[in-house]
A protein has these predicted regions:
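Active-site ligand-binding patch in enzyme domains
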Residues: 3-69, 74-221, 234
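C-terminal folded domains that constitute the principal catalytic or ligand-binding module
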Residues: 228-229
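Short active-site-adjacent structural elements
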Residues: 235-239
């Protein structure tokens, strides 16, 4: 089985330029935030980070995007996400800063959304927190689980590679992975996947989700729950 890879990113040469900072706005967000703890490495090498409290009807989502100086986020002949930053040969330290910030954002997240086609283009991707110190501070300072939950999203399940590296991570790593799809996607997964997939749902309304028992998601790391929303082959993103 596969093990998660960890390493410590050297921070002495991190190039992180804060373009604009408003202490007033930051303090307002901090007061309204569900969590106000700041990981020590983030405070030392970056700045305090706070996230707005999630609305009652949906999670708070954010993204990390790396662009080249001419505005490109991927190559036409190779859509793999990390290539733009990784191939910054003129300024490797800048590339390192991009990767560290990505790990910071992952460390603050409860879940990481992974498109099924991303798995197809990146055979070794896991979307866990690679930085060892951030992994530890995430648990000790933020009180979060060892790793954020991976959430694979697919309309109909047909584009999910069930032999991907991510589905064979050793349970001792405590890396949880779930799939979010439509009713038709769930049918396809149950008929074609060799893996263990407890089905949660289908959910047609937000109220259905509120009454669902999702507590067992983290009890079996050999299982990959399928969370079903919507109707037919159309999942309901609002749910």
């Amino acid at each position: 089985m596969n093990e998660l890879v960890f390493f410590e990113i050297p921070k002495q040469n991190l190039k992180i330029q804060i373009v604009k900072k408003s202490d007033e706005i930051l303090e307002q967000i901090r007061k309204e935030s569900a969590e106000t703890a700041v990981m020590p490495d983030v405070a030392q090498y970056y700045t305090d980070i706070y996230f707005p409290k999630a609305p009652s009807d949906r999670p708070y989502t954010f993204s990390s995007i790396v662009l080249s100086s001419d505005g490109k986020m991927a190559y036409g002949d190779n859509p793999s996400g990390p290539l733009i930053a990784k191939n910054n040969f003129l300024d490797p330290d800048g590339s390192l800063g991009d990767f560290w910030v990505l790990n910071v954002l992952r460390a603050y997240a409860d879940g990481i959304i992974i498109g099924a086609r991303t798995l197809l283009s990146e055979p070794g991707i896991t979307c866990h927190v690679y930085e060892e110190r951030l992994t530890r501070q995430r648990r000790e300072v933020l009180g979060k689980k060892y790793q954020p939950c991976g959430v694979i999203v697919s309309l109909d399940g047909t584009d999910i590679p069930f032999d991907h590296y991510i589905f064979d991570v050793d349970p001792k790593e405590e890396y949880k992975l779930v799939i979010a799809t439509s009713p038709r996607g769930a049918e396809y997964i149950m008929a074609n996947s060799p893996l263990k997939h407890p089905v949660i749902g289908p959910f047609k309304t937000i109220e259905d989700v509120d009454h669902a028992d999702l507590g067992e998601l983290y009890t079996d790391f050999n299982a990959f729950p399928v969370i079903v929303t919507g109707q037919g082959e159309n999942p309901d993103t609002k749910v």
